[in-house]
From Swiss-Prot:
<keyword id="KW-0597">Phosphoprotein</keyword>
<dbReference type="Pfam" id="PF00428">
    <property type="entry name" value="Ribosomal_60s"/>
</dbReference>
<dbReference type="InterPro" id="IPR050323">
    <property type="entry name" value="Ribosomal_protein_uL10"/>
</dbReference>
<keyword id="KW-0687">Ribonucleoprotein</keyword>
<dbReference type="Pfam" id="PF00466">
    <property type="entry name" value="Ribosomal_L10"/>
</dbReference>
<protein>
    <recommendedName>
        <fullName>Large ribosomal subunit protein uL10</fullName>
    </recommendedName>
</protein>
<keyword id="KW-0689">Ribosomal protein</keyword>
<feature type="region of interest" description="Disordered">
    <location>
        <begin position="285"/>
        <end position="314"/>
    </location>
</feature>
<feature type="compositionally biased region" description="Acidic residues">
    <location>
        <begin position="293"/>
        <end position="308"/>
    </location>
</feature>
<feature type="modified residue" description="Phosphoserine; by CK1">
    <location>
        <position position="303"/>
    </location>
</feature>
<dbReference type="GO" id="GO:0002181">
    <property type="term" value="P:cytoplasmic translation"/>
</dbReference>
<comment type="similarity">
    <text>Belongs to the universal ribosomal protein uL10 family.</text>
</comment>
<dbReference type="GO" id="GO:0070180">
    <property type="term" value="F:large ribosomal subunit rRNA binding"/>
</dbReference>
<dbReference type="InterPro" id="IPR001790">
    <property type="entry name" value="Ribosomal_uL10"/>
</dbReference>
<dbReference type="InterPro" id="IPR043141">
    <property type="entry name" value="Ribosomal_uL10-like_sf"/>
</dbReference>
<comment type="function">
    <text>Ribosomal protein P0 is the functional equivalent of E.coli protein L10.</text>
</comment>
<dbReference type="GO" id="GO:0000027">
    <property type="term" value="P:ribosomal large subunit assembly"/>
</dbReference>
Amino acid sequence: MGGKSANKAGYFDKLKGLLEEYKSIFIVSVDNVSSQQMHEIRQALRDQGVVLMGKNTMVRRALKTFLVDSPEYERLLPFVKGNVGFVFTNGDLKEIRDKILANKVAAPARAGAVAPVDVWIPAGNTGMEPGKTSFFQALGVPTKIARGTIEITTDLKLVEAGAKVGPSEATLLNMLNISPFTYGMGIAQVYDQGNTFPSSVLDISEEQLLKAFSSAITTIAAVSLALNFPTLPSVIHSLVNSYKKVLAVAIETEISWPEIEELKDRIANPEAYAAAAPVAAADSGAAAGGAAAEEEKEEEEESDEEGGFGDLFG
């Protein structure tokens, strides 16, 4: 009894120490993960993360004792179910996620196992003797005899994802040397500084965030303007619209201020401004031409001076 209490206290202390040392946790599913895979994952995460396994009842009990000082740990409790473990890290979450998921091994189908994906049998020659044709027929696999061997004529989905693999299906897959499943750690949830979220969030790029943020600002501004309810994104648009209205009123009335006089004059005398535009352009061109001529004249004078010096020393 004393040994169990000591083990429990030791586990509580270890879990508490890891929670205090690391800011991020991957809650990982370890169904069908072999001890060899677990060892390889620990090696891959060396100096970057720590893997901790434990009975769910003990983990939940430990977390509940920590809630008084750290209530944010309550967010972990809903995910402590099934065959799960913890990976603690302070590293880059996307990099650690990829290392956790990288260790996958192909596995043969076992009778009674739930298929995580659809299992297909590809068309092609099996190399098996015709005597086993009845076995294929019993499972509904289309075959023919070609050059003294059994040939599967079309691709066939043998087991659907989520269904249990039957004894006959498992036997056939093993006969064909097909290992349809891959097993490794999966990620149930990510905990980071008091927040929990699915690992797919780690794939959201900065460009996507900026696009979503920009779209949200545009929507808020549009709704605010429609409701005539000022918000930070809509204020600039409201000011511009209001100023346009003030200009419209000033143009139609005797209200005036220095900045509006030129606009009123442009509206009243458009021909004068239209005629002034080509003159301004011509003046600009003449000025540019004059500058070019002046520069050319200076170059000629410099050339003459150089010639004079040549005669002097010749």
